Amino acid sequence: MQTVLAKIVADKAIWVEARKQQQPLASFQNEIVPTQRNFYDALAGTRTAFILECKKASPSKGLIREDFDPAAIASIYKHYASAISVLCDEKYFQGSFDFLPIVSQVAPQPILCKDFTIDPYQIYLARYYQADACLLMLSVLDDEQYRQLSAVAHSLNMGVLTEVSNEEELERAIALKAKVVGINNRDLRDMSIDLNRTRQLAARLGPDVTVISESGIHTYAEVSELSHFANGFLIGSALMEQADLETAVKSVLLGENKVCGLTRPQDAQVAWESGA
């Protein structure tokens, strides 16, 4: 682990300690209840799954969406998403745990807390703020840390998206019996994108594992092609960059040609479910 990723994780450790002082676990742990929204079930089945992301900024792109309104975004995503991802990292992504309950209130889908999770405290905090799943990155966790964090998440009925970015991490994910494996096409060490990573790594995972392709997915053509390798996709920047969010969602998820004349979300939903 080095460069951008190492810096983010080092800063995250500082953030966690400060947040523990500001909002101790003991002050809210008794109010935490296990989730009823099943992340694993939401991504299961034969239909391509889409985790659509609420993301204001990123280290690679800077500010992505100036008029960032989580409720408005969720009100569109809820017609198309299998689950919704919410960036919670403050320093590098201008995210917030406060966005989680806003999105959860608008959309019925499971909500994924997208953060650099290194401490059980973050998982308890995520659930307190109504997240139904969390991201665990094998690039920043050793196996023992992963087991501990995964156990905390599952104790709260939360799902885990286990992220890998190379073959070594993939082998670890298999050994750790990860249920949902996200293959990150972005190299967090230098921020480069390579969609071949999904093609190369997905084939190694068995049929009992849900494979999600993450990062760098911008077009319906890419979704169509990579759907032969992955069960689903996590898409954020490609949508957040567009002023007309609904049109962007329909374009990337459904293909522009296939939704001509479909102006209402429910029409697009029907078209998608019928295989359009």
Label each region the model flagged:
Residues 1-67:
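An N-cap/entry alpha-helix motif that binds or orients negatively charged groups
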Residues 49-53, 83-85, 110-112, 132-135, ...:
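Structural preference for beta-strand elements that scaffold enzyme active sites
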Residues 61-154, 169-172, 198-201, 265:
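N-terminal active-site wall of soluble small-molecule enzyme domains
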Residues 118-130, 165-176, 216-235, 240, ...:
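Catalytic cores of alpha/beta
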Residues 195-205, 226-227, 239-260:
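C-terminal helical cap(s) of enzyme catalytic domains, especially alpha/beta-barrels
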